[in-house]
Amino acid sequence: MREKHYSEDNSRKRKRGELEHNSDLNETVLPSDWTPDPVKNFAADDDDEETKAKDATMVLPFVKKSPVWKIYESMEVFKRVPQSPHFSPLFEAKEDFREGFALGMMVTFSGVLEKVEDLKTDVPIRQLNSLKDSFTELEKHGFTVTAPLSRIAKLLALKDRQLKILEELKVFDKEMKDESSKKHKAEQEFGEMERKILEVKNKVLELQKQEAALEKQKDATYEKICKMESRARDLGVELEDVE
């Protein structure tokens, strides 16, 4: 019975020690003057209770120590587009680098968002894909990127349509050139044919003239023969009279 009591007493001491140890760990990881969410000021005043509860329980992979956070939190872009990134992928990074990486991503988000807002329809596809990759990476760290990705997707779709139209125009232009070449060739052949027809017409006209001349010559010869025959008959009559 004494051994059982001793064992239970030791068990209670171990549990109490574990709780105290865990309490010390919690104080080390989450000091009393540290807010779990390093970007809590990014949330809009009208955030719903669910978002507030989520932010309150968020545990980041680093302690917000840099005074630069206040500068970033007061930037217009984060007031206009509130953000609550969790930076959970940074748990895989070296601890000393985590906060710096997070600050870098804050700057990156501000920069790429500004670029997206200033995009024109003539933006190169390469730039759109680069921005898309940047926002996709930021999304992994908890940034809300639905709006910029949607704009990029629309511009990419527009670019895709433009490329298709350009391809269609290229095909159409080639077909137009082919048809124009055929038309030019047909015009040349038609011109050659007209020239030959004109030559034939001129030849026919010449032959018709020759025919008319021969017809006239034939008639003149016939008339002459008739006159000669008539004269021969007259001479025959005169000869008979003389006899």
UniProtKB/Swiss-Prot annotation:
Q: Which GO terms describe its molecular function?
A: protein homodimerization activity
Q: What happens when the gene is disrupted?
A: No visible phenotype under normal growth conditions.
Q: GO CC terms on record?
A: chloroplast stroma; nucleus
Any coiled-coil ranges, and where?
174-223
Subcellular location(s): the record lists:
Nucleus
Where is the segment annotated Disordered? Answer: 1-51
Q: Does the keyword Transferase apply?
A: no
Is Coiled coil included in the keywords of this UniProt record?
yes
What keywords appear on the UniProt entry?
Answer: Coiled coil, Growth regulation, Nucleus, Transport
| Tissues expressing the protein | Expressed in leaves, flowers and siliques.
> Where does the UniProt entry say this protein principally localizes?
nucleus
Write out the biased-composition intervals (Basic and acidic residues).
1-24
Q: How does it assemble?
A: Homodimer.
The role this protein plays is:
May be involved in the polar growth of plant cells via transportation of RNAs.
State the protein's name.
DUF724 domain-containing protein 5
Q: Which organism is it from?
A: Arabidopsis thaliana (Mouse-ear cress)
